[in-house]
Amino acid sequence: MDIIKKLAEELSIGRHQAEAAVKLIDEGNTIPFIARYRKEATGSLNDEVLRNLDERLKYLRNLEDRKSQVIASIAEQEKLTPELELKIKEAQTLVAVEDLYRPYKPKRRTRAMIAKEKGLEPLADLISMQMTAEPVEKAAAGFVSEEKGVASVQEAIQGARDILAERISDNAAFRTYIRNITMNKGVIQSSAKDEKAQSVYEMYYNYEEPVKKAAGHRVLALNRGENEKMLTVKILAPEEQILGYLEKQTIVRDNLYTTPILKEAAADSYSRLIGPSIEREIRSDLTEKAEEGAIKVFGKNLEQLLMQPPIVGRVVLGWDPAFRTGCKLAVVDSTGKVLDTVVIYPTAPQNKVEESRKILKDFIKKYNISLISVGNGTASRESEQIIVDLLKEIREQVQYVIVNEAGASVYSASKLATEEFPAFDVGQRSAVSIARRLQDPLSELVKIDPKSIGVGQYQHDMNQKRLGEALEGVVEDCVNKVGVDLNTASASLLEYVSGINKTLARNIVAYREENGAFKSRKQLLKVAKLGPKAFEQCAGFMRITGGENPLDGTSVHPESYDAAGKLLEKLGYKPEELSGGGLLGISRKIKDYKRTAQDLGIGEITLRDIAGELEKPARDPRDEMPRPILRSDILEMKDLEPGMVLKGTVRNVIDFGAFVDIGVHQDGLVHISQMTDKYIKHPLEAVSVGDIVDVKILSVDLAKKRISLTMKGVK
């Protein structure tokens, strides 16, 4: 197989692009590095295309390796023919390769094997030829043998039938046909193990839909219901059509004596061997596709969450709400440094409201707090009411935001949090995390396992390794899109930088602590175990503000410093002029990009990137994202009425819709059918996590705590 050609076709890119990307990946370059600094070679392939290419490259190479193993195994058995070898080499999927290998694959002891050991294969061949002019029983009598364990004529025929059934099952063409027809005409059906039992799976108690239309989130829901012993799930195939096909393929002559036996063999082969196997394969395939879709949605949601814009220059009060143990508060300055912590008890059972209000007023005055970040967990509603009442009394302009605290408790009990705040208890660490995730979501959320951040669906039911790798890739892409400040970034953030692992991240922090702030990117080469390759991969994503070389504060890669210097000189600028916030209009001064790029010895794409960076150094892509809604008043669910129009924040996007926070402690659901007037395949075509959207209330169910929203017809 020509892997490069296959990749180019699948991803709709040029062959030269696929070839260059594969070469760069094989040379050990990271996806963020290739996407940012090797655009010339790849024709500007972005990180998403490169990650898809990398994933498919691994699959196709694994496929080729498996083909080689299968060919070698069959050759060793001296059963390899040129036709079979060609079929294996031309196979496009692992399933197709395994189908071709099935007849030659070492098996556990089957009924057919036992029959062969009893010497019944010649009888199976006789039946298969369909030429006998006398009853098969007559020929079978010759195979009855006490020594071989064949006690009767019927036992001999049954053994021959078992051999024929396995031959039918091992036929790759038959399996392909049955797999395709089951996928296209089969029905996935579920029923309740106990119809009287109340559960979240009630809609699946008597449920069926065509296999080919089974939506990913429903497949995962059925799997979970089955695993929790609430549902029985099966695939109903068009059995009559399948048996008709098998009979047509295996019965070539209408022979009075062999036709009934062959029909029985075909039916047995399907019901005992092929059917259950194909059902397992299809269920596995549906699950894999559903997981793939869920991982993509999770990844997109995570990206939007990580790329929320930081809130700069404000002192934030982090508030971790609770009842019995009290609300933990942490004051964090504009750089993320913890100024103070305290525990207050305004909620039940202690209800020390006045004492708590006094502490809050003192904190707001003392630290000039202008923003309160409240976790959305237990006692969040009661905490919000206390804050709103307080804000009405004080003169200071203070706002608050309800923050998704998913993962805060996981982080606060982690080894990392213990190392960061050894003197704090779990609640204090959680309050700090809640404050910081509003100030700089990316820097804080990288400390938490992405699976704990709470923006996925069925994430605990899927392949954890696959999910973990995909989400790690998302975090890596986000960190490198934004870049990091080499002198303030934590080890948790640094480890996601291109070319940097956990060890190197810790070594960078250790070097910084021992030697003071980095003054130059070149100093990275003095960090233990950080060699030239790691430097090449990471340097462009590390920024130094106020360093020896102004270019170190940009995303211009050190390999392009010479070209950038010559460009500045050519246009009449000095490097130090960069420190003033960029050289506006520099890109317009370059009249002929092609000629200028040739003069500088770089590519035209690289020149445009350098010019853009000199114009606006280290621009933050998060600045273009929607900012969180800052509130100063409270809304109750009982206040909601159909027809009300509100502004809300998209908290989670799933296959069938999006959950929107409208400020009432219960996210409302905008079903996919209520998002736009035009047809969309997936909610992500209309919204993303973090989007600020206008919604209208459709209905409110106070008992079930459900809010239905629409985005249609909202002005």
Regions found by a protein language model. Give the residues of each.
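Short beta-alpha connecting loops at secondary-structure transitions
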Residues: 18, 341-348, 371, 413-426, ...
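Accessory alpha-helical DNA-binding modules that contact the DNA backbone or grooves
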Residues: 30-31, 46-113, 118-147, 481-624, ...
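Duplex nucleic acid-engaging cores and interfaces of nucleic-acid transaction enzymes
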Residues: 49-52, 59, 63, 68-318, ...
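Long, charge-rich intrinsically disordered scaffolds of nucleic-acid metabolism proteins
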Residues: 96, 401, 407, 412-482, ...
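Low-complexity, acidic/Ser/Thr- and charged residue-rich accessory regions of DNA metabolism proteins
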Residues: 139-153, 207-208, 245-251, 255-270, ...
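A glycine-rich phosphate-binding loop feature that marks nucleotide/adenosyl-phosphate handling sites
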Residues: 180-187, 319-323, 378-379, 403-410, ...
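Long, charged amphipathic helices and adjacent flexible linkers at domain junctions
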Residues: 281-299, 452-483, 598-642
